[in-house]
């Protein structure tokens, strides 16, 4: 999840502070014109259907030393492209600026960026390069929307809540390395080489489906709360239905936590969270993890018998 303005790192900002900062910026600046304005959703949508997204990474906040430069390049592209797909846009063009530090292997970083662009069918249109004390990557992706945007305000009571794939791997990887563990290579791959299901968003919009969609970059719980708030509904998440990445259970056992909690509270999964009619789940092979009801907020249901009637 993002917006026309990206939220600061969740490691240093609480959700309320993030929302207040975005509101401050949006209220202070002119925002007239777009169909979907800055701060309203995952990305901005211009009158002609162009979808625009911005994202940034810094070494100190987003890049653990275990992340290889080539994989950093890929991850950077994926993180920028993901929000365009979540809005229903087909990513087309990419520009980026980079502040290079003394640690980065520039050739490997560029190789990873190139691989990411080719993977998602995106062409480079320009950028800027400077040198500095810290590695900073800032990217912009433009895509084309064929249909209506997949707004986070589209959820309705009676909808199913679904995800495009398993979760928790990136969170388990980070927790493991911060505590001196050597996680499985599969967890590294999930953290370093995310593959957001852009084609799902594109086909949802092209097919005229009504769905609320966001990418899971800040964690399943946080993204569900964002959809519930923007749609004016309540969301139930049934934990026994949440798919968990391979290797998460081993890390969870080490820290005596429920593997599902690593999926709920993690981030950087870059799968899509989708709320929509039952036919959306069937058509796109999604995994149902809950339902949308009347009310507000998010309810975590851990016992099947505790479901709201």
From Swiss-Prot:
Mg(2+) 4 binds at residues 41, 83. Keywords: ATP-binding, Kinase, Magnesium, Metal-binding, Nucleotide-binding, Thiamine biosynthesis, Transferase. One of its GO terms (molecular function) is ATP binding. It catalyses: thiamine phosphate + ATP = thiamine diphosphate + ADP. The keyword ATP-binding applies. Belongs to the thiamine-monophosphate kinase family. This is Thiamine-monophosphate kinase. It comes from Methanopyrus kandleri (strain AV19 / DSM 6324 / JCM 9639 / NBRC 100938). The gene is thiL.
């Amino acid at each position: 999840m993002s917006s026309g303005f990206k939220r600061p790192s969740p490691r240093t900002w609480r959700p309320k502070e993030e929302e207040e900062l975005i509101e401050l910026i949006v209220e202070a600046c002119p925002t007239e014109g777009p169909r979907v304005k800055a701060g309203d959703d995952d990305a901005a949508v211009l009158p002609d259907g162009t979808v625009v997204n911005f994202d940034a990474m810094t070494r100190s906040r987003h890049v653990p030393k275990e992340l290889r430069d080539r994989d950093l390049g890929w991850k950077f592209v994926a993180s920028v492209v993901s929000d365009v797909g979540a809005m229903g846009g087909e990513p087309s063009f990419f520009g980026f600026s980079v502040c290079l530090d003394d640690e980065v292997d520039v050739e490997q970083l560029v190789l990873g960026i190139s691989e990411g662009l080719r993977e998602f069918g995106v062409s480079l249109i320009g950028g800027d390069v400077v040198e500095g004390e810290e590695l900073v990557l800032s990217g912009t992706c433009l895509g084309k929307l064929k249909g209506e945007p997949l707004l986070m305000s589209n959820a309705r009571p009676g909808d199913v809540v679904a995800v495009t794939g398993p979760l928790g791997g990136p969170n388990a990887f980070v927790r493991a390395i911060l505590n001196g563990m050597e996680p499985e290579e599969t967890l590294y791959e999930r953290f370093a080489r995310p593959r957001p299901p852009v084609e799902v968003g594109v086909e949802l919009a092209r097919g005229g489906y009504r769905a609320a969609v966001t990418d899971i970059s800040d964690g399943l719980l946080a993204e569900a709360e964002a959809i519930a708030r923007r749609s004016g509904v309540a969301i139930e998440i049934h934990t026994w239905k949440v798919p968990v990445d391979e290797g998460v259970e081993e890390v969870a056992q080490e820290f005596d936590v429920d593997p599902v909690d690593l999926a709920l509270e993690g981030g950087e999964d870059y799968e899509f969270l989708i709320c929509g009619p039952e036919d959306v789940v069937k058509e796109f092979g999604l995994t149902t993890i809950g339902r949308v009801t009347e009310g507000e907020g998010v309810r975590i249901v851990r016992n099947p018998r505790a479901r709201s009637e």
